[in-house]
């Protein structure tokens, strides 16, 4: 049974409206944000998460950060734009879309510095809305390309949430699932719960179920068994950054899934909007990996699952080497090895 689609991000009444994803699946709460500081906090505590929608949120955050700025000089306004962008960039270090969106907003301000301060503010809001619109179209295009690799009746495994909740619509890794549903195909989706924050079970399973898509939740350590039983024909994941050589940073646990897929000879696809591709970063070794609080691992639901004094290592992401990647699916087409050469081509 299909239910109303959850909308992760909206611009409404001169405010950024976000679906608080920390409360899902038990509560559906939308919250308004009217300052750059509140947007920073929403990104950092993961009320909003997923590289594409983080980028869109940050773009709106730039506008909110300068909206009330009273300085009348061009230099003063540009200094404030840079200050807000630098501040928002500290919210989460791994998602390259965040930095891409902030750089784009800063460039727009610099390119239009001849306008009045009021006009500049309007121009920044227009650009944030354009980034928002572009993401919707990018997601659909990724889905259309990915669908050429799928067929009716396939079993597909995904990890974490690269769905409509991580973007503005359709998602990246889930886009072909939504489009397959529109075509009347019956894909059987398996969603890793994705420890420690459980985005696969709380988010991916929630949104696919609401869309009427066949989805089964499994724990992360069940993936090997499900693959060995022949239930998985393809794996598709999103990513937070693609290095120039095709290494990908994605939610912790993705590396293990890629190793299993390679062992069982299952195609491993990565859905990646071009803003996620970072040609300035040579390999995955140079991608900064965010480490998060120990409580996410040992006190996830307000009750300790390990001794309170336990040492905890909690990286939010891992890096999958390009050798494990069958193809990277972008809005411009499907990229296969050699990635160093072919990733450059899509920007030409």
UniProtKB/Swiss-Prot annotation:
Binding-site positions, substrate: 49-51, 92, 199, 250-251
Pfam families: IF-2B
GO biological process per UniProt: carbohydrate metabolic process; L-methionine salvage from methylthioadenosine; pentose catabolic process; toxic metabolite repair
GO MF terms held by the record: intramolecular oxidoreductase activity, interconverting aldoses and ketoses; S-methyl-5-thioribose-1-phosphate isomerase activity
Active site: 240
Residues under site feature: Transition state stabilizer: 160
Pathway: Carbohydrate degradation
InterPro entries, A to Z: Deoxyribose1P_isomerase_DrdI, IF-2B-related, IF-M1Pi, IF_2B-like_C, Initiation_fac_2B_a/b/d, M1Pi_N, NagB/RpiA_transferase-like
Enzyme's top EC category: isomerase
Alphabetic keyword roster: Carbohydrate metabolism, Isomerase
Similarity annotation: Belongs to the EIF-2B alpha/beta/delta subunits family. DrdI subfamily.
Protein function: Catalyzes the isomerization of 5-deoxy-alpha-D-ribose 1-phosphate to 5-deoxy-D-ribulose 1-phosphate, as part of a 5-deoxyribose salvage pathway that recycles this toxic radical SAM enzyme by-product to mainstream metabolites. Also seems to be able to catalyze the conversion of methylthioribose-1-phosphate (MTR-1-P) into methylthioribulose-1-phosphate (MTRu-1-P). However this enzyme may not function in methionine salvage in B.thuringiensis since it exists a paralog (MtnA) present in the methionine salvage pathway cluster.
Quaternary data: Homodimer.
NCBIfam families listed in its UniProt record: eIF-2B_rel, PRK05720.1, salvage_mtnA
Protein name: 5-deoxyribose 1-phosphate isomerase
Species annotation: Bacillus thuringiensis serovar kurstaki (strain ATCC 35866 / NRRL B-4488 / HD73)
């Amino acid at each position: 049974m299909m239910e109303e689609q959850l909308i992760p991000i909206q611009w409404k009444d001169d405010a950024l409206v976000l679906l608080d994803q920390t409360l899902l699946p038990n509560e559906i709460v939308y919250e308004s944000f009217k300052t750059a500081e509140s947007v920073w906090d929403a990104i950092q505590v993961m009320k909003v998460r997923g590289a594409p929608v983080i980028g869109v949120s940050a773009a709106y955050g730039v506008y909110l950060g300068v909206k009330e700025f009273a300085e009348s000089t061009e230099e003063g306004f540009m200094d404030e734009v840079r200050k807000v962008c630098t501040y928002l960039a500290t919210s989460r270090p791994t998602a390259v879309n965040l930095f891409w969106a902030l750089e784009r907003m800063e460039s727009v301000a610099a390119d239009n510095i001849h306008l009045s301060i009021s006009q500049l503010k309007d121009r920044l809001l227009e650009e944030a809305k354009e980034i928002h619109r572009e993401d919707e179209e990018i997601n659909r295009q990724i889905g259309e390309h990915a669908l050429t690799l799928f067929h009716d009746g396939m079993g597909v495994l995904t990890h974490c949430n690269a769905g409509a909740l991580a973007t503005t619509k359709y998602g990246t890794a889930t886009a072909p699932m939504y489009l397959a549903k529109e075509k009347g195909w019956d894909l059987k989706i398996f969603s890793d719960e994705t420890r420690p924050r459980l985005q696969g079970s709380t988010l991916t399973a929630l949104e696919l179920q609401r869309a009427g898509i066949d989805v089964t939740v499994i724990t992360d350590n069940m993936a090997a068994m499900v693959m060995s039983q022949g239930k998985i024909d393809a794996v598709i994941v999103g990513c937070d950054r693609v290095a120039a050589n095709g290494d990908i940073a994605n939610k912790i646990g993705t590396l293990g899934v890629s190793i299993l897929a390679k062992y069982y000879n299952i195609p491993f696809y990565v859905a990646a909007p071009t803003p996620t591709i970072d040609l300035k970063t040579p390999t995955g070794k140079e991608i900064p990996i965010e480490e998060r609080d120990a409580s996410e691992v040992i006190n996830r639901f307000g009750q300790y699952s390990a001794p309170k004094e336990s040492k905890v290592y909690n990286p939010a992401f891992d890096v999958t080497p390009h050798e494990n990647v069958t193809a990277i699916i972008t809005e411009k087409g499907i990229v296969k090895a050699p990635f160093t050469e072919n990733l450059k081509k899509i920007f030409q």
